Curated annotation (Swiss-Prot):
Residues 336-358 are annotated as: Disordered. The lineage of its organism: Eukaryota, Viridiplantae, Streptophyta, Embryophyta, Tracheophyta. Gene3D superfamilies: NAD(P)-binding Rossmann-like Domain (3.40.50.720). Residues 348-358 have a biased composition (Low complexity). This is Arogenate dehydrogenase 2, chloroplastic. GO terms for biological process: tyrosine biosynthetic process. The gene is TYRAAT2. It is found in: Plastid, Chloroplast. It comes from Arabidopsis thaliana (Mouse-ear cress).
Length: 358
């Protein structure tokens, strides 16, 4: 508590009491006069403590690849109070400054900042070249490396190949993007695999602190191995992107009489067409299960075509010859009764029955 003193006017008694005024009514010395009390208020103290705690618990995160997806994630990371530094092949200094991040055009300068976490937001195709040329020796040996690629076995293998053994590895996949997650991340899947996290309590806590960012945003947190992720993703994400691009090539357009199902198709095209073909190619090239899914899609499409044309062929035969359209088995039996050509399976069955009777 601070005491401020200032001169004060002497206390003047009424005229009839001035002579007999007691000594205790005399004004205090000017040097001891209290003018104001400057004390910190409770809410100011709590705000200060909260600010200091937030700074102490903040992570310094280096984002490699500050393109569309990197900027999308960075806005949320900064909103959670973390310190962001970025690097990319292109100059994104203006974009970084606009959200409160710092941009470094040289990866050596970025590593000199000693980030707690290095977050790879590069494309699938450029990931290996980025890791191969990255100056790991300038980082602390306990640095946590995180990727957000749409395939998981591929970056896991690259991390193990190129990263020093002292570094921690966390493979993640936020299964949403700037379009599907532009309003909220609530309920959207976030898949992660703690590939290599040190036993030290500080390293365990750092990993959990990073994951809590997405948990606090309401993401559906799914811990899953990289191998299992790629198996499921080939049947969901790759198929989704494939159908979206097929419908885009087909040219679906909105109409005045859209059904709910058709609106879903339009949304699918919108969500997938905004992603680069490089991403789609990466989903195909670097997921070992993607080719099988593409072949299954092709077989399913051919099966539907055959079913449609088969039904059309039956209707055509009915119009041409009249009467009930017979199934293939009934047709074979009719040919037998009419003395037509006998199928080979019927010949073999009849011969076997005759031999048994003899």
């Amino acid at each position: 508590m601070l005491l401020h003193f200032s001169p004060a006017k002497p206390l003047i008694s009424p005229p009839n009491l001035r002579r007999n005024s007691p000594t205790f009514l005399i004004s205090p010395p000017r040097s001891l006069r209290i003018r104001a009390i400057d004390a910190a208020q409770i809410f100011d103290y709590e705000t200060q403590l909260k600010s200091e705690y937030r700074k102490s618990s903040a992570l310094k995160i280096a984002v490699l690849g500050f393109g569309n997806f990197g900027q999308f994630l960075s806005k949320t990371l900064i909103r959670h109070g973390h310190d962001l530094i970025t690097h990319s092949r292109s100059d994104y200094s203006d974009a970084a400054n606009s959200i409160g991040a710092r941009f470094f055009d040289n990866p050596h300068d970025l590593c000199e900042q000693h980030p707690d976490v290095v977050l790879l937001c590069t494309s699938i195709l450029s990931t290996e070249s980025v890791l191969r040329s990255f100056p790991f020796q300038r980082l602390r040996r306990s640095t946590l490396f995180v990727d957000v690629l749409s395939v998981k076995e591929f970056p896991k293998a690259l991390f193990i190949k190129y990263l020093p053994k002292e570094f921690d590895i966390l493979c993640t996949h936020p299964m949403f993007g700037p379009e599907s997650g532009k309003h909220s991340w609530s309920g959207l899947p976030f898949v992660y695999d703690k590939v290599r996290i040190g036993d030290a309590a500080s390293r365990q806590e750092r990993c959990e602190k990073f994951l809590r960012i997405f948990e606090n945003e309401g993401c559906k947190m799914v811990e899953m191995s990289c191998e299992k992720h790629d198996y499921y993703a080939a049947g969901s994400q790759f198929v989704t992107h494939t159908m979206g691009r097929v419908l885009e090539k087909y040219g679906v357009e909105s109409s005045p009489i859209n059904t709910k199902g058709y609106e879903t198709l339009l949304d699918l095209v919108e969500n997938t067409s905004s992603d680069s073909f490089e991403l789609f190619y990466g989903l195909f090239m670097y997921n070992p299960n993607a080719l099988e899914q593409l072949e299954r899609l092709d077989m399913a499409f051919e099966s539907v075509k055959k079913e449609l044309f088969g039904r059309l062929h039956q209707q055509y035969r009915k119009q041409m010859f009249g009467g009930e359209v017979q199934s293939p088995k009934k047709t074979e039996q009719k040919l037998l009764n009419d003395g037509g050509v006998v199928p080979m399976n019927d010949i073999s069955s009849s011969s076997s029955s005759s031999s048994s009777s003899s």
